[in-house]
């Protein structure tokens, strides 16, 4: 009888490959905005540097439904949604990869902060940290880190 063996992908190698999936800046931002629309946001604001002296960072803020800590943690998991799962016709999401792959195709650090029922949650995928640790480690931010 065949023996089962778990074969976990090498974290920095796979994340590096996913970062190279060919997103343009515009399509990456559109993918993240689609998540805002799926969360019934009526307001989406895109923040980006306007001068060379500003830090190179893009922020996408919305007034969508938000996610609980548990739901946000799951949303930050690569492959968090089955391709066969039912979803709205106009929802671009299919495999639970878009937000992470789109965002990290343009940067080395993805932080998502969510507010749900007066509670804040935040997680960060940091490509450099994953390379250092050689593991799929996501960082949970403290309230103080969220405020900064």
Regions found by a protein language model. Give the residues of each.
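Bergerat-fold GHKL ATPase/HATPase_c domain
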Residues: 1-49, 70-74
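Residue-level signal for pocket-adjacent positions within structured domains
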Residues: 9, 13-16, 62, 90, ...
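General structural signal for secondary-structure boundaries
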Residues: 9-15, 68, 126-128, 142-145
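Amphipathic alpha-helical transducer elements in NTP-driven molecular machines
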Residues: 22, 26-30, 69, 92, ...
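Conserved beta-strand-loop-beta-strand hairpin that lines the nucleotide-binding pocket
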Residues: 36-87
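GHKL-type ATPase core
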Residues: 85-148
């Amino acid at each position: 009888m065949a023996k089962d063996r778990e074969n976990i992908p090498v974290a920095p190698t796979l994340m590096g490959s996913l970062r190279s999936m060919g997103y343009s800046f515009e399509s990456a931002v559109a993918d993240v905005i689609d998540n805002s629309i799926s969360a019934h946001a009526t307001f989406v604001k895109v923040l980006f540097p306007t001068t060379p002296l500003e830090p190179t960072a893009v922020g996408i803020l919305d007034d969508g439904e938000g996610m609980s800590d548990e739901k946000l943690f799951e949303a930050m998991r690569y492959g968090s949604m089955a391709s066969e799962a039912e979803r709205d016709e106009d929802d671009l999401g299919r495999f639970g990869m878009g937000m992470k792959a789109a965002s990290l195709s343009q940067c080395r650090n993805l932080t998502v902060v969510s507010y749900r029922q007066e509670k804040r949650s935040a997680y960060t995928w940091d490509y450099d940290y994953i390379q250092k640790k050689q593991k799929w480690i996501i960082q949970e931010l403290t309230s103080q880190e969220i405020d900064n």
